[in-house]
C-alpha cells in the first residue's frame, strides 16, 4: 500500500493535465544513480509486455530499487494506479559529439484512446547540461493527437523546453507528449532510461485530492502555452477540460464556458399554445 503522503497533489495533477508532464529534480539518490549507470552501460533485463510492473524488475537491481522509491511509487500510483503493467523500456543513448538530433515526435503509432492514457518515466542518471542534448519537450502538446513523427518537420516551437537537469532527475510524461532527443555536443555519452506503463484501473482520483477545491487548480488548468494559436489554442483548453473531467469524475467541470456551451443541446420541447 502506497503511503498517501507520497501521492501527487491536485495542483500537481492539474499541472500534468495542462502540461502533459511532471518533473522531479534529483529524485534518485547519488548511490542509486551510480549503480544505475553501471546497469545502463550493459543491459537492463525486462519482461514481456503486459507483465505487472511489480514483477518486472528485481528488487536487488538498481532500476528495481528506483521503481520502489516512495516518491516514484507515489507518482506511478497517482497517474496509472497501484498495479500498472509494464509496456516496454529502452536505454536511450546520445553519442558523444553526435551531429544528429531526433525529429520531434510522439511515441508509437497514433493513440486514439480518449481519455485514458499511459505514462512514460524518463530517468537521467547523470547531470545533463544544455550542450549534452537532453530531451526536448513541448508542453501542452499531449492532447493534440499525432502519428509518431508526422510533426518532425517542425522545429523551434515557442515555449519548448530543452531539458537541463541534475543527476537523478525523473520525468513523468503523458504518452502523447511531443518530444525529441537533441544533439549531444559534448565529449561524453548521454544516457536516459525510459519505461512505459499501462493502467489497469480507471484513472479517476488516484492521487491525494485534499486540495481539489483549491482555486489554484482551476487557474493551472486554464493556462495557455506560447505555441498555442489564439483560436486553436482554445481547443486545447476544451480538450484539457474533458481530460480533467475524466480524472476527477466531475462531468460539470469547465475552465470557462467553452465546453459547457458545446454540450448545450436541450431535449425539453416547448409547446406553443
Where are these regions (language model features)?
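Non-heme Fe(II)-dependent double-stranded beta-helix
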Residues: 1-112
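A structural signal for short, well-ordered beta-strand segments
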Residues: 89-91, 121-123, 193-197
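A conserved mid-domain beta-alpha-beta active-site/ligand-binding segment of alpha/beta enzyme cores
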Residues: 156-169, 220-223, 231-232
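Non-heme Fe(II)/2-oxoglutarate
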Residues: 182-273
Amino acid at each position: 500500500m502506497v503511503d498517501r503522503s507520497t501521492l501527487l497533489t491536485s495542483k500537481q495533477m492539474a499541472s500534468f493535465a495542462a502540461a502533459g508532464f511532471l518533473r522531479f529534480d534529483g529524485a534518485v539518490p547519488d548511490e542509486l544513480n551510480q549503480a544505475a549507470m553501471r546497469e545502463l552501460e550493459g543491459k537492463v533485463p525486462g519482461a514481456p509486455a503486459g507483465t505487472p510492473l511489480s514483477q518486472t524488475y528485481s528488487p536487488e537491481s538498481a532500476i528495481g530499487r528506483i521503481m520502489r522509491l516512495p516518491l516514484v511509487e507515489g507518482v506511478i500510483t497517482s497517474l496509472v494506479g497501484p498495479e500498472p503493467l509494464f509496456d516496454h523500456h529502452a536505454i536511450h543513448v546520445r553519442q558523444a559529439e553526435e551531429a544528429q538530433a531526433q525529429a520531434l515526435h510522439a511515441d508509437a503509432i497514433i493513440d486514439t484512446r480518449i481519455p485514458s492514457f499511459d505514462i512514460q518515466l524518463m530517468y537521467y542518471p547523470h547531470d545533463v547540461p544544455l550542450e549534452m542534448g537532453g530531451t526536448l519537450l513541448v508542453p501542452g502538446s499531449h492532447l493534440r493527437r499525432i502519428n509518431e513523427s508526422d510533426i518532425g518537420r517542425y522545429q523551434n516551437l515557442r515555449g519548448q523546453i530543452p531539458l537541463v537537469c541534475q543527476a537523478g532527475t525523473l520525468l513523468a510524461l503523458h504518452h502523447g507528449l511531443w518530444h525529441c532527443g537533441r544533439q549531444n555536443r559534448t565529449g561524453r555519452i548521454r544516457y536516459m532510461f525510459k519505461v512505459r506503463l499501462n493502467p489497469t484501473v480507471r484513472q479517476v482520483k488516484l492521487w491525494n485530492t485534499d486540495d481539489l477545491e483549491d482555486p489554484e487548480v482551476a487557474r493551472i488548468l486554464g493556462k495557455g502555452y506560447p505555441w498555442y494559436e489564439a483560436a486553436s489554442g482554445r481547443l486545447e483548453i476544451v480538450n484539457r477540460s474533458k481530460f480533467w473531467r475524466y480524472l476527477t469524475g466531475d462531468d460539470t467541470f469547465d475552465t470557462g464556458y467553452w465546453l459547457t456551451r458545446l454540450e448545450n443541446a436541450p431535449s425539453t420541447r416547448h409547446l406553443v399554445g
